[in-house]
Amino acid sequence: MTAYPQFDVILKALNLSSVGVIITDPEQKDNPIIFVNTGFENITGYAKEEALGSNCHFLQGDDTDKEEVAKIRHAINEKSTANVLLKNYRKDGTSFMNELTIEPIYDDHEHLYFVGIQKDVTTEHDYQLELEKSLTEIEKLSTPIVPIKENICVLPLIGSLTHDRFQHMSEYVSEYMDHGKEDYLIMDLSGLAEFNEDAVMNLVKFHGFMKLTGVELIITGISPKFAMTLIRYEENLASLTTYSTIKEALQFY
């Protein structure tokens, strides 16, 4: 029997856990691993005998986020907690996303150790990346640029021109214009559900942005209600060319 009868139960519980558990000793040189559970072996593919005595950095690769690693180093130096997301590598060379939490603990003799809890979140991480990719594609669909002539394209806006949408629109148009040869961009506002002062200010900013790119901005589809809002900003938009419809604008270009 051990001095602590509960020890065997605790060890068995740790080895039944699906998460990886590591204990390191920062008071030894290079903070070596002194304990790993079965969950660690299952996640990484490394046997206990291969991991013990090593520093955890053997799981890292060239593309492991250096800033996240620095957070771990800082926590160890400060004897504090850290929560990080690391790209780690299994023994077979395949990568996995490791959601790692480290905590300082002390034994009865005030000897410092660190406990690390590993969770393989590769599936969740990949799902999040796919979701973000899909949202980006949806945003592009909400800002369609339609080539009309060799040097003219149309940007029809539908819905509302929020700050976030304006930011995305500016980035998307900038990227598009960098690869195109357009001299004119017709922005059609006939599909906008609302046109408040924030939208006008965004339009003023976009007008200035287009001037810098050398592309002339033409506005179409301004309703009488929108026109009343624009009057207050007439000085900022004095050089802006407007037409009632896209068809009317194309007669002059």
UniProtKB/Swiss-Prot annotation:
Q: Where is the PAS domain?
A: 6-79
Residues that bear S-4a-FMN cysteine: 56
Task: List GO molecular-function terms, semicolon-separated.
Answer: photoreceptor activity
Q: Which Pfam families match?
A: PAS_9, STAS
User: Residues in domain PAC?
Assistant: 80-133
Q: Does the keyword Transcription apply?
A: yes
Query: At the top level of its lineage, which domain of life is listed?
Result: Bacteria
Which InterPro entries does the record cross-reference, listed alphabetically?
Bact_StressResp_Reg, PAC, PAS, PAS-assoc_C, PAS-like_dom_sf, STAS_dom, STAS_dom_sf
Alphabetically sorted, this entry's keywords are:
Chromophore, Flavoprotein, FMN, Photoreceptor protein, Receptor, Sensory transduction, Transcription, Transcription regulation
Q: Which PANTHER family match?
A: BLUE-LIGHT PHOTORECEPTOR (PTHR33745:SF8), RSBT ANTAGONIST PROTEIN RSBS-RELATED (PTHR33745)
This chain's function reads:
Exhibits the same spectroscopical features and blue-light induced photochemistry as plants phototropins, with the reversible formation of a blue-shifted photoproduct, assigned to an FMN-cysteine thiol adduct. Positive regulator in the activation of the general stress transcription factor sigma-B.
Name of the featured protein: Blue-light photoreceptor
Organism expressing this protein natively: Listeria monocytogenes serovar 1/2a (strain ATCC BAA-679 / EGD-e)
